[in-house]
Amino acid sequence: MKSNTPTEDSTKWMLESVEIDSMGESSSKEPEINLNKNEGGLKKNASRNLGVGSIIRTLSVSNWRKSGNLGSPSTRKSGNLGPPTNAVPKKTGPQRVERTTSSAARGLQSLRFLDRTVTGRERDAWRSIENRFNQFSVDGKLPKEKFGVCIGMGDTMEFAAEVYEALGRRRQIETENGIDKEQLKLFWEDMIKKDLDCRLQIFFDMCDKNGDGKLTEEEVKEVIVLSASANRLGNLKKNAAAYASLIMEELDPDHKGYIEMWQLEILLTGMVTNADTEKMKKSQTLTRAMIPERYRTPMSKYVSVTAELMHENWKKLWVLALWAIINVYLFMWKYEEFMRNPLYNITGRCVCAAKGAAETLKLNMALILVPVCRKTLTILRSTFLNRVVPFDDNINFHKVIAYMIAFQALLHTALHIFCNYPRLSSCSYDVFLTYAGAALGNTQPSYLGLMLTSVSITGVLMIFFMGFSFTLAMHYFRRNIVKLPKPFNVLAGFNAFWYAHHLLVLAYILLIIHGYYLIIEKPWYQKTTWMYLAVPMLFYASERLFSRLLQEHSHRVNVIKAIVYSGNVLALYVTKPPGFKYKSGMYMFVKCPDLSKFEWHPFSITSAPGDDYLSVHIRALGDWTTELRSRFAKTCEPTQAAAKPKPNSLMRMETRAAGVNPHIEESQVLFPKIFIKGPYGAPAQNYQKFDILLLVGLGIGATPFISILKDMLNHLKPGIPRSGQKYEGSVGGESIGGDSVSGGGGKKFPQRAYFFWVTREQASFDWFKGVMDDIAEYDKTHVIEMHNYLTSMYEAGDARSALIAMVQKLQHAKNGVDIVSESRIRTHFARPNWRKVFSELSSKHEACRIGVFYCGSPTLVRPLKELCQEFSLESSTRFTFHKENF
């Protein structure tokens, strides 16, 4: 900010603080910054078009005082900090920044050289460092390349090496041949000092390698490259020169060719505010104040927690209770029936328990097919039954029944082999003839004879097929966590699970044979196995076979566009079959006959229901997905934009058929054939019944929620036509015609949606960059808040990410573009503080129903569920948790 008066020309301004949203920033928000000049009350609202250089100079030089240890070489020697003395009127000698207590606290939190976990445990950490020193030192000297490993910065060796050099220059220690333990202790003490100036001095010494107190553009670039490498930000590293130029442009308005240390310090101390901590404490206090009296004693809280669990899971409870009651009833009915059977006098209770287990086994072998009739369940989700039946837990119920089947089958088999058969074959002939002769004939069988009957053989084979299929369906096998040696490695992974499950067809055939050819002869109408299985098997077979034949004919789709992203992700845009109606959050199955004629794989639909195309984003994790990505990569060519990349752009390969080639059918010879079937219901499709949405996606787990965001965004865009009319939408950033969903009809939508996307790769943000930019542009009322988190980066305040945070702030303020995601949505470092997120939502949306939808790694399921329960109990807001299951 410049002025025509001499007094104002000589005034330097300092950024006291920049308010940062504790959960994340939406680029559509304009931060409000208070500017105080001298003792005047000048206040201005900083918008995106406010120059960053003018923001830097927001406080007058009257806030400087003596002492310190930063600045020019002369000020360093004298132990003082400040700008050149000629920049401060009416002052003599070097000066230092006047920091308020809150400002110092913010700066202290905003510059750490070690992980936050070390704070408060410095003594324990030093003992570990001593042990590592003894391990890695050579002749009592620790070499530079082992310094990072020794102090706990082993994953950022280059950055640790620069810290090593800076600490050596600071202590005037010759470090070329390594350092001893005493010198290492001095380095360690400097790094953990609570003195803000000491930490800043180390950081500045890293930047200012020649020690002249001035940073040139080349030195700034080197530190940006170093920080980008430490945080695994390849694209930022490529553009380091541009970002160094940006810093020089904003901090060196007079084009001196350098910036001074005090200018960099001003910007660094303004990056983080303590408002987050205050806000969290305030929200927690308010939340605790809202706790009803009945929750405040241990017993009352236990009762309340139990009641809350029952309220949250009442659908599951009544279904499981009904299922358990039926199982117990059938077991006891058959048990009592055989207590009156003559065989009871020979085998005792063994035959009763075996027959009871067999009866419940028939029931469960029939029921286990119901949860996997996906098409039927999808239809039922839209009926009144969805209010009382937990369709979202179909896979979990399927697993529970499977465990029960395994138990009942083993119990039934063990009782026959180890109890019934030995007693029947070893009892006296007279006893056998008296009690078993009428059922088994006059010839007493041997144990081997009983084992070689058709009943025993089919039973053992059935156990083998079921055991094999169940084992490969376990989490460790299905997710390929178990690493088997060759050639047994083919038994782990999704393909093994999928094909092994088809062996259960043989198990069902054997079950029917096993239940019909009994050792104890009965009339056909008393053989009930086929009665249990007939309807479920016919129903399941018709859904799998007949509907598949029809769907493959009508659901052969044409590829509109395929995009191969870095990060092993393939985005497919295909034609939408006539009559293919779905809701946001649903998924569909995809098959590529060129790869496998029998494999179908589920993927969330990422297009909105109103689009006239279908899209899925597929991450290459297994053999099938990897080969599919490879096939499409061969047909993809770099686009013109990718051939000449713009600054901050991510490289991608794509190919298009629609819009470029009007003969789309002819162009399909380039691509592998694609078939789809669906759509199928998923928990996220019920998002509309909640007041507020909290959508949490980890990595590729964001896909179910992209369709929801697109659908909501379509209702926010101005001038959206009614259903049936065309509008120009976007597909992966490219313009393509589509149908919009109707904005009328009284369709209920949530009031707000908070989307938290947590990923560990910078390239992931390119998958949905177009959606993020559309939200920033069209969501003027802030209905959708996006919070992107990159876990590969060190959290805000770490020295390894401090300069990146500064560049990010400058770039976003100047151009409205985030340097990490390269979209208009701001990216946060490390992981979200979920307790803070829930605390703020509960205080912000009192007495609202918040739907928490999660898709990603199982590690986060339990913490999110516990937070939902905790804050539902302790506030008037009710959180309902849903997890995506395929």
Swiss-Prot record:
Localization (cell): Membrane
Binding-site residues for Ca(2+), renumbered to this chain: D208, N210, D212, K214, E219
Phosphoserine modified-residue sites: S283
Region (EF-hand-like 1): 137-145
GO terms, molecular function: calcium ion binding; oxidoreductase activity, acting on NAD(P)H, oxygen as acceptor; peroxidase activity
Principal EC category: oxidoreductase
Extracellular side: 338-404, 478-499, 547-688
Keywords assigned by UniProt, alphabetized: Calcium, FAD, Flavoprotein, Membrane, Metal-binding, NADP, Oxidoreductase, Peroxidase, Phosphoprotein, Repeat, Transmembrane, Transmembrane helix
Mode of membrane association: Multi-pass membrane protein
FAD-binding FR-type domain residues: 552-686
Biased composition (Polar residues): 64-78
Keyword Cytoplasm: no
Top-rank taxon: Eukaryota
Domain Ferric oxidoreductase: residue ranges: 355-512
Entry's Gene Ontology cellular component terms: membrane
Family per similarity comment: Belongs to the RBOH (TC 5.B.1.3) family.
Its job: Calcium-dependent NADPH oxidase that generates superoxide.
Subunit: Monomer and homodimer.
Protein name: Putative respiratory burst oxidase homolog protein H
Organism from which the protein derives: Arabidopsis thaliana (Mouse-ear cress)
Gene that specifies this protein: RBOHH
